[in-house]
Amino acid sequence: MSPTGTRIDHDIILDIVPRGAKVLDLGCGDGSLLEKLVRTKDVRGSGIEISDEGIRECIARGLAVLQEDIDHGLKDYPDRSFDYIILNQTLQAVKKPHVVLSEMLRVGEKAVVGFPNFAHWEMRMYLLLRGRMPKTEYLPYEWYDTPNIHFCSIEDFDGYCDRFGLRVERRIYLSNDRGGRVLRGVCPNLFAESAVYLLSKK
């Protein structure tokens, strides 16, 4: 959270997406990010969510949302039908991350991807000292009820982008530790709790 009580990753994404853009938010949850984009950036926004609860909350916010499983792809959407496709704090929960990321850059001109960094030093120490699966603000679940199935680090994601020829236009590293900005810049894989990437095709 920021000092004003807003989510830092949401603030970053609000800064990335230009006013009036056509946006699709995948795994939009309760619609809080999409609602901010619609209200503050005047985007033409819609969302996709799989949970019944998330759908109800999005509808209550007056958002355009479809109930679908993004692991099945975005076959109903033509190429380049959106300016920005967002996948925030959802990458680790999808069954087929490569399919989802590929579809994002087929359907959208640019992709915004936010994910928790499983190589953060606190995660490493938690596992080393406690011998248990780590729990953090971004990964608050117990091992037996977590929706997360594909954990990755910042180094993992950079390697993925290199392997599949994705252009990284921006990388923003996030942490609740304000004093860690320099350390995040020097060694983000160790000191960033999460990251937000802006991607496009080369």
Stretches with model-predicted labels:
Residues 73-79:
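Short conserved loop adjoining the S-adenosyl-L-methionine
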Residues 32, 36-73:
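Class I SAM-dependent methyltransferase SAM/SAH-binding core
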